[in-house]
From Swiss-Prot:
Cofactor mode of binding and number, as noted: Binds 1 [4Fe-4S] cluster.
Disulfide bonds listed in the record: none
Cofactor: [4Fe-4S] cluster
Species name: Homo sapiens (Human)
Motif residue range(s): DEAH: 395-398
Keywords carried by this UniProt record: ATP-binding, DNA-binding, Helicase, Hydrolase, Iron, Iron-sulfur, Isomerase, Metal-binding, Nucleotide-binding, Nucleus, Phosphoprotein, RNA-binding
Entry protein name: Putative ATP-dependent DNA helicase DDX11-like protein 8
PANTHER family: ATP-DEPENDENT DNA HELICASE DDX11-RELATED, DNA REPAIR DEAD HELICASE RAD3/XP-D SUBFAMILY MEMBER
Localization in the cell: Nucleus, Nucleolus
Gene3D superfamilies: P-loop containing nucleotide triphosphate hydrolases
EC number from the UniProt entry: 5.6.2.-
Gene Ontology CC terms, in alphabetical order: nucleolus; nucleus
GO biological process, one term: establishment of sister chromatid cohesion
Upper lineage: Eukaryota, Metazoa, Chordata, Craniata, Vertebrata
GO molecular function: ATP binding; DNA binding; DNA helicase activity; hydrolase activity, acting on acid anhydrides, in phosphorus-containing anhydrides; iron-sulfur cluster binding; metal ion binding; RNA binding; RNA helicase activity
Length: 907
């Protein structure tokens, strides 16, 4: 469909088709938020075109912002003077060129001629800088335009360069083989295999640019550019980002916008030797090590005498080629490409897409990236992301607080602590005589920390953790300082230990050592540690047994860290958090191996504060953002954002208002529906749910999705129905499917559910489609779309409150009660948190249905507590506006029957 330009007020919004009125409102409000430099919380239900509204609204603002800036620069260059002090929009001067421009306050008492002279000089300097920037920008635009029209010539030039490089490499290898001979080459390989694992000399005051994410060497000077004003758009998963890039391509801005997709090394690496390492941490460390080796090799060649011979032998990455990466960067900016296209281009050009994407950031107008790269400060810095005066849009942000909390919370087990200690001891035994004193000092400190962590759990580092029974069991919560004192490690500088781990990459060396040699013990220690060696072997993956073992539904498969020390480094870093912002949870189970130490982040705002402080504007968007009080209080208020800077926007749905959300307060036998912890296990309550579902399945043609508060409760109800015969009555109306706890079985169940509905729709019979019994917080309550016949009715059984007895939740509640003020007439912040967690889960679950304009479904909330005004206020606006509260079941089932009969007749 042809692109159309919509005018909302005085603003023109290009759009691929005629937008809904709610999309126009969304874009206009988004434009105002970005222009005024606010923090916006935007809610737009699924099916309302949120992605296109974000794209067209934000890029329209960026278009106008750049136009105003160009006009202002032209005026300044024409008049040769700086900006006036009383100009209304000082935000036009955002780049570094405007720093220290006209208007810099002068010391009081200076003669007027001095002030005038300095001001004139500043104005001339500003004009000169603007001229340089204008010339640089013009050069960049011309280069990108040439690329767009000369793609074939560029490919030919790349192929020619590759052939020349391959010829040169072959000649170089031939010369080396002639010079060294086969014996020397074999000796070199044997030495390098061993030497790679030995720690290089550590200099604590040395600042290596690679480890901190800065430029690798001087070759990048030519590639460094000014960071123009841009929009950072982030989402949770790479698939969501790929879908967003696809929407950008379809938009009116698709041909002109300079977009770059960022990802992790694991997603963008094209070096198969590095990719084969599997673990994200191993890939990161190996990549940085190769770039460091390249830098040190170059430095060593200049100085003629490298410190260690192994630094010369370490191979540099063949894909880290500045000329090729520059070409790849320009090609990526010339037209919109997703991550798969970037990978293909990187392989073809033999250039690294990961570093290429970093080089493209300064000139890009739209940067697409996953949550972790934006919200984790070290990752952000390593990627070369600069947020100063930029715009950030966080999409799918309903779980933003949980994401930040989870990203900075770390849990280590007793078995991991013991395994890391054993590996490190073996490493020191093998290479101790070759290590410098500073390396030995830090390794002994790490060993001491591991020993004390095991001791604080009540175990002994020298014994097998699987066979160690702890005298005390239970959960204990400590402040960070109390934990350090109790562990007797308060005298160790954890900041220095953390820095050593990062710079020396000891965990990668240790992983390489254990991977190459396995569990190596001296003959002196063999008898004492024989049992422990057996334990270490038991931790290794056993492919044959894993394939033969039946799938365990009670536990989803969790990826194991590549090296226990890599994981423990994260725990050490977490212990450097401010005392008031986190807690340490000691969980002592039956054995040491099952016991854990967990750092719990209480204040996610401490990691979000820098984002809102540096950015011009931040937009937090999602399909269901209610209740928003958590965002306002836990993230924004605690990050120092003033309430006046926060703007809320919630648009309606594109669907007709006749889709009925119902609150049913009592069952068929007039049993009040209140699924509290004390009442939900009563037989009459479980019977009421079964009878209500039987009636709903009798009047709803299509799929019915019923959500329970937990897997345990679902199984309990299912067993009760089976025993009492209700399950058979339900099965006579709809085929029953049950959500598995094992994540890898979810797709299989969904496929069977979908096929059943499709088959029943074609062959009308007594069984009308299917009933899916799901769990709030499970895989099917988030990210799965039950559109059309897959979800004609969504039922929520009770209110899925989190476990109030959880030590983590209790500590979080206490923290909020102490930190946040209590509003008059409102519940304490801790209690409000529990209710908000419940309602967020409800909103996510019921939002699985009604996915587009012509879709329809009935939403049934089975619990009289939903009728309370404070609870209703936390439902999404489009549901809240049309919800009906039914005191008894009769009128409720009649309304559902009428609704579906009318929909069936009109379809």
């Amino acid at each position: 469909m042809a692109n159309e330009t919509q005018k909302v007020g005085a603003i023109h919004f290009p759009f691929p088709f005629t937008p809904y009125s709610i999309q126009e409102d969304f874009m206009a409000e988004l434009y105002r938020v970005l222009e005024a430099g606010k923090i916006g919380i935007f809610e737009s239900p699924t099916g309302t075109g949120k992605s296109l509204s974000l794209i067209c609204g934000a890029l329209s603002w960026l278009r106008d912002f750049e136009q105003k800036k160009r006009e202002e620069e032209a005026r300044l260059l024409e008049t040769g003077t700086g900006p006036l002090h009383d100009e209304k929009d000082e935000s036009l001067c955002l780049s570094s060129s405007c720093e220290g421009a006209a208007g810099t306050p002068r010391p009081a008492g200076e003669p007027a001629w001095v002030t005038q002279f300095v001001q004139k000089k500043e104005e001339r300097d500003l004009v000169d800088r603007l001229k340089v920037e204008q010339a640089r920008r013009k050069q960049r635009e011309e280069r990108l335009q040439q690329l767009q029209h000369r793609v074939q010539l560029k490919y030919a030039a790349k192929r020619l360069r590759q052939e020349e490089e391959e010829t040169e490499n072959l000649l170089r290898l031939s010369r080396e083989m002639l010079e060294t001979g086969p014996e020397a080459e074999r000796l070199e390989q044997l030495e390098s295999g061993e030497e790679e694992l030995v720690l290089a000399e550590y200099e604590s005051d040395e600042e290596k640019k690679v480890a901190s994410g800065h430029r690798v060497d001087e070759d990048e000077d030519d590639l460094e550019e000014e960071h123009i004003t841009k929009i950072y758009h982030c989402s949770r998963t790479h698939s969501q980002l790929a879908q967003f890039v696809h929407e950008v391509k379809k938009s009116p801005f698709g041909k002109d916008v300079r977009l770059v997709s960022l990802g992790s090394r694991q997603n963008l690496c094209v070096n198969e030797d590095v990719r084969s390492l599997g673990s994200v941490q191993l890939i990161n460390d190996r990549c940085v090590d190769m770039q460091r080796s390249r830098h040190e090799k170059k430095k060593g060649a200049e100085e003629e005498k490298p410190k260690r011979r192994r630094q010369e032998k370490q191979a540099a990455c063949p894909f880290y080629n500045h000329e090729q990466m520059g070409l790849l960067r320009d090609e990526a900016l010339a037209e919109v490409k997703d991550m798969e296209q970037l990978l293909a281009l990187g392989k073809e050009a033999r250039a690294c897409p990961y570093y290429r994407s970093r080089l493209a950031i300064p000139a890009a107008k739209l940067v697409v990236l996953p949550y972790q790269m934006l919200l984790h400060a070290a990752t952000r810095q390593a990627a070369g992301i600069r947020l100063q005066d930029q715009v950030v849009i966080i999409d799918e942000a309903h779980n933003l607080i949980d994401t930040i909390t989870g990203m900075h919370s770390v849990e280590v087990s007793g078995s991991q602590l013991c395994q890391a200690h054993s590996q490190l001891l073996q490493y020191m035994e093998r290479y101790g005589k070759r290590l410098k004193a500073k390396n030995l000092m830090y390794l002994k400190q790490i060993l001491y920390l591991l020993e004390k962590f095991v001791a604080v759990l009540g175990g002994n580092i020298k014994q097998n953790p699987n066979t160690q029974s702890l005298s005390q069991t239970g959960t204990e919560l400590k402040t960070i300082n109390d934990f350090l004192f109790q562990s007797q490690i308060d005298n160790i500088n954890l900041f220095k230990v953390q820095r050593y781990c990062e710079k020396s990459m000891i965990s990668r060396k240790l992983f390489g050592f254990t991977e190459r040699y396995g569990a190596v013990f001296s003959s002196r220690e063999q008898p004492k540690l024989a049992g422990f060696q057996q334990f270490l072997q038991s931790l290794q993956p056993r492919t044959t047994e894993a394939l033969a073992a039946p799938a365990d539904e009670s536990q989803a498969s969790v990826p194991q860290p590549a090296s226990p020390l890599m994981h423990i480094e994260g725990f050490l870093a977490a212990l450097t958090t401010a005392n008031q912002d986190g807690r340490v949870i000691l969980s002592r189970q039956g054995s040491l191996s099952e016991s854990t130490l967990k750092f719990l982040l209480l204040n996610p705002a401490v990691h979000f504060a820098q984002v809102v402080k540096e950015c011009r504007a931040v937009v937090i968007a999602g399909g269901t953002m209610q209740p928003v009080s958590d965002f306002r209080q836990q993230l924004l208020a605690c990050a120092g954002v003033e309430a006046e800077r926060v703007v809320e926007f919630s648009c309606g749905h594109v669907i007709p208002p006749d889709n009925i959300p119902l609150v049913i307060c009592s069952g068929i036998s007039n049993q009040p529906l209140e699924f509290t912890f004390q009442k939900r296990d009563l037989p009459q309550m479980m019977d009421e749910v079964g009878r209500i579902l039987c009636n709903l399945c009798g009047v709803v043609s299509g799929g019915v999705v019923c959500f329970f508060s937990s897997y345990e409760y679902l199984r309990q109800v299912h067993a009760h129905w089976e025993k009492g015969g209700l399950l058979g009555r339900l099965a006579a109306r709809k085929k029953i499917f049950q959500e598995p706890k094992s994540a890898h079985q979810v797709e299989q169940v969904l496929l069977a559910y979908s096929r059943c509905i499709q088959a029943c729709g074609q062959e009308r019979g007594q069984v009308t489609e299917a009933l899916l019994l799901s769990v709030v917080g499970g895989k099917m309550s988030e990210g799965i779309n039950f559109s059309d016949n897959l979800g004609r009715c969504v039922v929520m059984v009770g209110m899925p409150f989190p476990n109030i007895r959880s030590a983590e939740l209790q500590e979080k509640m206490a923290y909020l009660d102490q930190t946040l003020p209590r509003a008059p007439g409102q519940a304490p912040p801790g209690k409000a948190l529990v209710e908000n967690l419940c309602m967020k889960a409800v909103n996510q679950s019921i939002g699985r249905a009604i996915r587009h304009q012509k879709d329809f479904a009935s939403i049934v909330l089975l619990d009289q507590r939903y009728a309370r005004p404070p609870v209703l206020a936390k439902l999404p606006a489009w549901i809240r506006a049309s919800v009906e509260v039914k005191a008894t079941f009769g009128p409720a089932i009649a309304a559902v029957q009428k609704f579906h009969r009318e929909k069936s007749a009109s379809s």
